[in-house]
C-alpha cells in the first residue's frame, strides 16, 4: 500500500460527505495492517477542551483536599505544633511551602536574609499562601506566621517604643524611619 493511499484513506475517514446520494466506490485492494506494540494510540482531536476540564478538576481536587485537611484538624484534639524556620536563602522557601501543604503552621524569621532576598521569598510565600488558601500574617518586624486554611490568627497591633527607632525594613515595601 502506498503512502498516497494511506493518506487518502486517512483524509476520507475524517471528511463528511455532504451529498450522501452519490454511490460509494469500493476498492478491492487488500488491506495490510501491521501490529506493533510500540505504536502510540491516536490522540483525541478535542484535546484543548480536555485540558480545560483537567484544570478545573485539579482545582476541585485541591479545594476538596483543603476542606479535608480542615475537617481532620478540627476533629483532632492533639496539641498544635508551629514550626519555626530561619531561611537563609530564597531556595528555603520551597521547604516552607511543603510544610504548609502538609497542613502545618510555620513561623518564619527573615533575620538571616538580606532585604531583597526576604522580599522575594515573602512574595513567593504569599503566592503559595493564596494558592493553598492559607494565611500569612506579620507578627514582628522580620517574623511572619504562615498557617493553613483551618487556623485563625488574631494579631494585636502592638507598637513597641524601640521599634520605631530602628531603621529596618518591614518587608512590606515601606521603610520605618524616624522623623
From Swiss-Prot:
As for subcellular location, the record says:
Cytoplasm
Q: Which InterPro entries match?
A: Cell_div_SepF, Cell_div_SepF/SepF-rel, SepF-like_sf
Where do the record's region annotations for Disordered lie?
19-55
Q: Could you tell me which Gene3D superfamilies the record lists for this protein?
A: SepF-like protein (3.30.110.150)
Question: Which family is this protein grouped under?
Answer: Belongs to the SepF family.
In terms of HAMAP family, this protein maps to:
SepF
Q: Describe its partners and assembly state.
A: Homodimer. Interacts with FtsZ.
This protein is called Cell division protein SepF
**What organism is recorded for this protein?**
Streptococcus pneumoniae (strain JJA)
Amino acid at each position: 500500500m502506498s503512502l498516497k493511499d494511506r493518506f487518502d484513506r486517512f483524509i476520507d475517514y475524517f471528511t463528511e460527505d455532504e451529498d450522501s446520494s452519490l454511490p460509494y466506490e469500493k476498492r478491492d485492494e487488500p488491506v495490510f495492517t501491521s501490529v506493533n506494540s510500540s505504536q502510540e494510540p491516536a490522540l483525541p482531536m478535542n484535546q484543548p477542551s480536555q485540558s480545560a476540564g483537567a484544570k478545573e478538576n485539579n482545582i476541585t481536587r485541591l479545594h476538596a483536599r483543603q476542606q479535608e485537611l480542615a475537617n481532620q484538624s478540627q476533629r483532632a484534639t492533639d496539641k498544635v505544633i508551629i514550626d519555626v524556620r530561619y531561611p537563609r536563602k530564597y531556595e528555603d522557601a520551597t521547604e516552607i511551602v511543603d510544610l504548609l501543604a502538609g497542613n502545618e503552621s510555620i513561623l518564619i524569621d527573615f533575620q538571616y536574609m538580606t532585604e531583597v532576598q526576604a522580599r522575594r521569598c515573602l512574595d513567593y510565600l504569599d503566592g503559595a499562601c493564596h494558592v493553598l488558601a492559607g494565611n500569612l500574617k506579620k507578627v514582628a518586624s522580620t517574623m511572619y506566621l504562615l498557617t493553613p486554611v483551618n487556623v485563625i490568627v488574631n494579631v494585636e497591633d502592638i507598637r513597641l517604643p524601640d521599634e520605631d527607632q530602628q531603621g529596618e525594613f518591614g518587608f512590606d515595601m515601606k521603610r520605618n524611619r524616624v522623623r
